[in-house]
Curated annotation (Swiss-Prot):
GO biological process, one term: rRNA base methylation
Protein name: Uncharacterized RNA methyltransferase Atu0735
Range of residues in the leader sequence: none
Classification via PANTHER family: 23S RRNA (URACIL(1939)-C(5))-METHYLTRANSFERASE RLMD (PTHR11061:SF49), RNA M5U METHYLTRANSFERASE (PTHR11061)
Any Pfam family the entry gives: TRAM
Active-site annotation: C374 (nucleophile)
Organism: Agrobacterium fabrum (strain C58 / ATCC 33970)
Family of the protein in this entry: Belongs to the class I-like SAM-binding methyltransferase superfamily. RNA M5U methyltransferase family.
């Protein structure tokens, strides 16, 4: 380890400040462009020891757990709370612009859709049993160390206010000091708590869990690795006003605000399409909204998610027909011959993107496509495939679903 004073030239894709040293770039978390900082350097990583000259874009973080001086350690949940709003918004938009540019794409890119603090309805916590109880928080960046949190300005107050209840539920299920994960989804009927990383619970633990949950208010369900352990109330969320009970541990957009913004962009482009395919549809985030305007074929690999979607569609009046298909689109994409049945296609894949499916789409005659992605790099790759097939990207909109992190959602609309 060496100590030296450096000047930060730019922000990297992970939100770290980048300094240029004789032996190459050095990445310095929590440092901003234009700042002069003293760092402790190990290989290409720097730790801020002091700030000699601060940037005018620096601001005080809103959370006590943020940064090198955070309470209980440096929480890895956020990396950009110290950056003022305007340059922060520009940074997020540039993540999308630069990813597109790397594939030779220069479509119109909208300003960032801004999401507010306290909107995150789904959070994944790290947890571990200790002598004092249950340690609950987020892992420190690039570390297995769990930073115990007492607040979280990103997460919904409906979750933050129940930290004690979440700890009690986790503690009733765990027998050793191995770390595990607790995913909490705030639903209209209470918290939906999904635990992963614990192999099993015995009969005594089940009884303790049941007693713990029934003594509380506002807990809808507790599950372990997808198995429902107790469900006082069926968890309910709404997709465009349509009630859905998502599967235990299933995927849900992190914030309703971002989901609504993405859905609005999607619906505006799909317009009056009569036959629509929703690929990687999950529990119906977009499919159920689309069914108000046209027939929908919803495709997803997760059986429980499809069943939730199907049940919601069958029990909602006023929707056009919705068909569902269980299918692994990474291995068995909809072929060009199948795609000829649709006027519009919407796809929202995991971070890996939809490369194989896009190769089929590129050869199709589908008039309108909406691509939703949480990874600008794989989105750019997929859009490049589609443009090579004759599609034109008419608009890309970045959405700040992951506040104060280096991650960004984006919606791209295409036509042929």
């Amino acid at each position: 380890m060496s100590t030296q004073t450096v000047t930060i030239k730019s922000l990297g894709a992970q939100g770290d400040g980048i300094a240029h040293c004789p032996d190459g770039p050095v990445y310095v978390p929590f440092a901003l462009p234009g700042e002069t900082v003293a760092i402790a350097k190990v290989k290409d990583q720097g730790t801020v020891m002091s700030i000699t000259e601060a940037s005018a874009d620096r601001r005080d973080p809103v959370c006590r757990h943020f940064g090198p001086e955070g309470i209980n350690g440096t929480c890895g949940g956020c990396s950009l709370q110290h950056l003022a709003d305007q340059p922060y918004h520009a940074f997020k938009r540039e993540l999308v612009v630069s990813a597109l540019r790397s594939k030779g794409l220069t479509p119109p890119v909208d300003d960032l859709v801004i999401c507010r603090p306290g909107e995150r309805r789904r959070a994944v916590f790290a947890a571990r049993k200790t002598e004092k109880g249950l340690l609950l928080g987020f892992s420190q960046a690039n570390s297995h160390h769990i930073v115990a949190i007492e607040e979280c300005p990103v997460t919904s107050p409906g979750i933050v206010s129940r930290f004690d209840a979440i700890r009690a539920i986790g503690l009733s299920m765990v027998a050793n000091a191995e770390p595990f994960r607790i995913t909490v989804l705030e639903t209209l009927s209470g918290l939906d708590i999904s635990v992963e990383g614990i192999k099993s619970v015995n009969d005594k633990q089940r009884r303790t869990l049941t007693e713990t949950v029934l003594a509380m208010r506002g807990i809808a369900r507790v599950s372990l690795s997808g198995e429902i352990l107790i469900e006082p109330q069926k968890p309910i969320i709404e997709f465009g006003g349509i009630p859905v009970s998502p599967p235990a541990g299933g995927f849900t957009q992190a914030t309703k605000q971002a989901e609504d913004a993405m859905a609005e962009l999607m619906l505006a482009h799909v317009g009056k399409s009569k036959r629509i395919a929703d690929l990687f549809c999950g529990s119906g985030t977009f499919a159920l909204r689309l069914a108000r305007i046209g027939r929908v074929h919803a495709v997803e690999a997760e059986d429980k998610a499809l069943k939730a979607l199907d049940f919601a569609a069958r029990n909602t009046q006023g929707l056009k027909p919705v068909s569902v298909e269980k299918r692994d689109l990474f291995r068995r994409p909809l072929m060009t011959s199948e795609l000829k049945n649709y006027d519009a296609v919407v796809f929202d894949p995991p971070r890996a993107g939809a490369e194989v499916q896009c190769k089929e789409l590129a050869r199709s005659t589908v008039k309108k496509i909406v691509a939703v992605s949480c990874n600008p790099l794989t989105l750019a790759r997929d859009l490049a495939i589609l443009t090579e097939g004759g599609y034109r990207v008419t608009r890309v909109t970045p959405v700040d679903q992951f506040l104060w992190s280096p991650h960004v959602e984006a919606v791209a609309v295409l036509e042929k």
